Amino acid sequence: PGAVHQILYGIGAVALAILAFECLPDVRQAMQMLNTVSQTSKQTKHNGAWVYGSSSARFTIVEYADLECPYCKDYFPQLKAWVDQHPDVNLQWHHLPLPMHEPVASYEARWAEWAGIERGNDVFWLAVELIYQRTRSNGAGTAGNPQIPGLEDRQHSIDNCASSNPAVRQTVVSQAHKASQDGITATPTLVIKDKVSGRSIKLQGAPDGDVLLSAIDWLASTKDL
């Protein structure tokens, strides 16, 4: 039995080493592709949160979203376009794959997460956009993984790491757990934060631009109690 255990342990170690190698980005390929993806936009270094818009914006809208949620799918382009028109507001993504949409929802969340790790902030948001464009929603998923322009050589790595990379898996699980701790169990849900006052407000569903502006005005005008 001891010899068998040693053999099995050795096989497992080799498998983990191969997986780790597969999930490591190719530095030379990344450098060659630097100017082929999002040439006209600025890449933002990943620091634990994916943020769309100005990093210096006073207000942050944290969107708790599921990539298989049909309501999130419809709302995402509207919210993104609204942020484009309001430079003092940025958008932060928070993964919340719902149990009813598993296992596809978590896989897609990991896929977008790893795409962002591979090539940065802009590619993460592009991955989210592509998934929403292609998914049949409600757990049905996409007909094949999205293809990100300029990342063809890394596609296999992204697909594999979305399935098996433990760090990416933990990121998605941790964000979903944090949402549950905060009492957020439905998507989409927004939490708007004011960096100046430190206050925040939660909005459930898909509020339109007028509601978003009203919430921001309330945060900006509320006095200390």
Regions found by a protein language model. Name each.
Residues 39-40, 70, 167-168:
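Short, flexible loop segments at the rims of nucleotide/cofactor-binding pockets, characterized by
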